[in-house]
Amino acid sequence: MDRKMLKSKIHRATVTGADLHYEGSITIDKDLMEAADIIPYEAVCIWDVDNGSRFETYAIEGERGSGVICINGAAARMVAPKDLVIIASFVNMNNEEALKHEPKLVFVDDQNRMLPARKEVAGQGTLKKVAW
């Protein structure tokens, strides 16, 4: 049996731009792509923390060290600059591989600079509660 597993994610990155008239994709700082093991044209899921939008696109390399996270094409209507997003990639693997798998987790600050590596913490964490 194969399982679809989280391969990597860039957690709570700040959107730096939204370019409606570009052909599509998400432009990601090359340093962040390498840290998250995402290659050009790889499919990624984007989850907007601020408005709940969820969509899939593909990654293209942005300038190394720039902190760029730019949503391109039609998906630009689903985000706004300064929104926080989670960028996730997935991989299929057999059950034996899946049981040993550790995803690459990339945490960033509000300028999309990498923070020290750490394990993901389950539960409520320290985030503010959302008032509905």
Swiss-Prot record:
Pathway: Cofactor biosynthesis; (R)-pantothenate biosynthesis; beta-alanine from L-aspartate: step 1/1
Similarity comment: Belongs to the PanD family.
Name of the protein: Aspartate 1-decarboxylase
Organism this protein belongs to: Geotalea uraniireducens (strain Rf4)
Subunit comment: Heterooctamer of four alpha and four beta subunits.
EC number: 4.1.1.11
Reaction equation(s) it catalyzes: L-aspartate + H(+) = beta-alanine + CO2
Cofactor note: Binds 1 pyruvoyl group covalently per subunit.
Primary location recorded for the protein, binned into one broad class: cytoplasm
Cytoplasm among keywords: yes
Enzyme type, top EC level: lyase
